[in-house]
C-alpha cells in the first residue's frame, strides 16, 4: 500500500486481510478527524428502518442528517472533502457498473450536480450518454491511433458540437483530439468501477458499500 508509515489505511487493510474487523472512526461523531490528518473514515448510511424521523437515527448514521448513501456520496464529492482538504483529485469507486446504484447512475447524479447543462456550454450526445465541456472521462479500450489506453482518465477541454469532436486533457498534460468515433470509447469518470481503478492513484477515494453490491462484497474488494 503506497501510504505513509502512520497511515490508518495500512493498518486497516492488514486487519481486513486477516479477517479482522477494523474500528474506523466516523467524522459524524468525531468531526475533528476532518482536520487532524486521519486518512481513513467510515460513515454509516444505514442500520435501522427508513422513514423514521431524522432525530431517531443514531448520531453516527448519516440518515440522522437526512442523507442516504447516494446523497452522502454526492455531498462528500461536491462540498465536504474540499472544505477540509485542498484537492480536486477525488475519485468515487463503485464495485458494479450496471445497477440502480452502479457507476452509470452515480455518474449521472454527480454530472448533474457539478457540470449541468448551461447556456454557452457545449455538449454532445452519443447513444445513452451526454458529455459536456469540463466533464471527467475515462477511456475504456486501447486506441493506438490516438495513443490513449484503457483506464486513462482526463477532462474534456472543449467540444465542437457540429463535427462531434472534442479535446481532452489527460493527467500527463497531453491534449488529445477526439473524433466522434473515438468519443464512443469514453465514459464519465466521476465514478468508476474498482476494476477500472487498478493501477491508478488518487488523492482521495470515496467507496460506497451497499447491499445492492452483495455479489461483489468480498474481502479482497477492500
Indicate where each model-derived feature is located.
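Extended aliphatic helical segments
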Residues: 69-70, 114, 137-138, 148, ...
Amino acid at each position: 500500500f503506497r501510504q505513509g508509515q502512520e497511515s490508518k489505511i495500512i493498518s486497516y487493510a492488514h486487519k481486513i486481510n486477516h479477517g479482522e474487523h477494523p474500528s474506523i472512526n466516523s467524522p459524524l461523531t468525531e468531526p475533528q478527524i476532518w482536520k487532524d490528518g486521519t486518512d481513513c473514515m467510515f460513515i454509516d448510511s444505514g442500520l435501522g428502518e427508513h422513514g423514521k424521523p431524522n432525530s431517531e437515527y443514531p448520531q453516527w448514521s448519516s440518515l440522522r442528517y437526512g442523507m442516504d448513501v447516494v446523497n452522502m456520496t454526492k455531498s462528500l464529492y461536491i462540498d465536504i472533502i474540499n472544505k477540509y482538504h485542498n484537492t480536486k483529485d477525488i475519485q468515487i469507486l463503485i464495485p458494479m457498473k450496471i445497477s440502480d446504484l452502479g457507476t452509470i447512475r452515480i455518474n449521472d447524479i454527480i454530472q448533474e450536480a457539478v457540470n449541468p447543462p448551461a447556456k454557452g456550454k457545449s455538449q454532445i450526445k452519443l447513444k445513452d450518454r451526454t458529455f459536456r465541456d469540463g466533464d471527467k472521462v475515462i477511456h475504456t479500450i486501447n486506441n493506438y491511433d490516438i495513443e490513449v489506453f484503457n483506464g486513462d482518465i482526463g477532462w474534456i477541454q472543449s467540444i465542437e458540437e457540429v463535427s462531434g469532436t472534442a479535446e481532452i486533457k489527460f493527467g500527463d498534460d497531453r491534449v488529445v483530439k477526439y473524433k466522434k468515433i473515438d468519443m464512443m470509447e469514453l465514459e464519465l469518470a466521476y465514478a468508476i468501477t474498482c476494476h477500472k481503478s487498478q493501477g491508478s492513484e488518487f488523492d482521495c477515494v470515496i467507496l460506497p458499500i451497499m447491499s445492492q453490491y452483495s455479489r461483489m462484497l468480498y474481502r479482497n474488494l477492500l
